[in-house]
Design a protein with these regions (language model features):
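Residue-level detector of alpha-helix initiation sites
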Residues: 10-12, 113-115, 154-155, 279-280
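Beta1-alpha1 glycine-rich phosphate/pyrophosphate-binding loop at the start
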Residues: 2-74, 157-183, 253
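A Rossmann-like FAD-binding core segment of flavoenzymes
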Residues: 66-96, 101-104, 165-262, 302-308
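FAD-site-proximal beta/loop scaffold in flavoenzymes
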Residues: 114, 125-141, 237-284, 288, ...
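Short, well-ordered coil/turn residues at beta-beta hairpins
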Residues: 8, 110-112, 117-119, 150, ...
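Phosphate-coordination loops involved in phosphoryl transfer and adenosine-cofactor binding
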Residues: 1-3, 79, 128, 143-145, ...
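Glycine/small-residue-rich loop that forms an oxyanion/phosphate-binding "nest" at active or ligand-binding sites
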Residues: 73-143, 152
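Internal hydrophobic alpha-helix adjacent to the cofactor/substrate pocket in enzyme cavities
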Residues: 22, 161, 165-172, 287-308
Length: 308
């Protein structure tokens, strides 16, 4: 029986594991992989203490830091996805996709979120046939082509910036007039001569033959439909929390985020905390996720000493 199980491999989970080990709590971290969502980012400029770092390097650094503490107080199971959590009088029991079971007195969920799929006619047909969800992974395959980015957040504009380095042109489609991305990023990308931005647009359908060759969108102001020819479509329309395995265990909000007390990251269920993008916190960033986990660990430490 562990004192604490941590689910996840991103910044929140890594921070939780480091703090748990340093507090000498008998802990287990279970993750399918290390790094979180940022592993697909070409360059991260706001990871405090490092002016710039690639997403892949960040993932490697997180793993290295966690593994430094692997030993008497920290076990790590990598390559396993948690599929169920059962709460009982003694604590919690988790089960992985590979059939492994582990039990603990307390639980920190830092399972993050996944990419939202494009909702448009034929989007499923052309996934991996021109529709992709990772510019840094697949972008070079579209060198010299006209491409489209869907989404007006930081991820959308960062993807556009990457693609402008080798694509013929980039058209960014945004659902509204305003962008969720940082203003400095928006202005930098907009200034590129091969960049075009379309606002108030909803994607209706994707067409092609063997691969994508066009996208049709509707102007939400006029109702008119327009077609854009493109060889690739990069989707950056937000995230869906990875919390499906928790729906019968702890309260989730309308989109599946874990409801927490922001003062200590505790859920309404005693003995279970959550941190990072899987929670209903107002803001989500790598640095915030780490802070969430540290708050949670401080509270978990006190709770365990009261309830052991």
């Amino acid at each position: 029986m562990y004192d604490l199980i941590i689910i996840g491999g991103g910044p929140a989970a890594a921070a939780g594991a480091v703090y748990a080990a340093r507090k000498q709590l008998k802990s287990l971290l279970v993750t399918a992989e290390f790094g979180g969502q940022s592993t697909v980012s070409e360059t991260i400029y706001n990871w405090i203490g490092t002016p710039e770092i690639s997403g892949r390097q960040l993932g490697e650094d997180l793993k290295k830091h966690v593994m430094y503490y692997k030993g008497p107080f920290l076990d790590v199971v990598e390559g396993e996805k948690v599929v169920s959590v059962v709460k009982n009088d003694k604590g919690v029991t988790i089960k992985t996709e590979g059939g492994k079971e582990f039990s603990s007195l307390s639980l920190l969920v830092a399972s993050g979120s996944g990419r939202r799929k494009l909702e448009a006619i034929n989007a499923d047909v052309y996934e991996n046939k021109g529709i992709t969800y990772c510019a840094s992974c697949d972008g070079p395959l579209f060198s010299g082509m006209d491409v489209i980015v869907i989404g007006g957040g930081n991820a959308g504009f960062e993807s556009a910036a990457q693609l402008l380095a080798y694509c013929k042109s980039v058209t960014l489609i945004n659902r509204s007039e305003t962008f969720r991305a940082d203003a400095i990023t928006v202005e930098k990308v907009k200034a590129h001569p091969n960049m075009k931005i379309i606002i108030n647009a909803v994607t209706l359908r994707v067409d092609g033959e063997q691969f994508v060759n066009s996208l049709t969108y509707k102007d939400t102001n006029t109702g008119e439909e327009h077609k854009i020819e493109a060889g690739g479509i990069f989707v950056e329309t937000g995230q869906i929390p990875n919390t499906g395995f928790l729906k019968d265990v702890i309260p989730l909000d309308e989109i599946g985020k874990i409801i927490v007390d922001p003062t200590n990251q505790a859920t309404p269920i005693p003995g279970i905390w959550a941190a990072g993008d899987a929670t209903n916190g107002k803001y989500h960033q790598n640095n915030i996720a780490c802070g969430d986990a540290v708050k949670a660990l401080e509270d978990i430490y006190i709770w365990l000493h009261k309830n052991k």
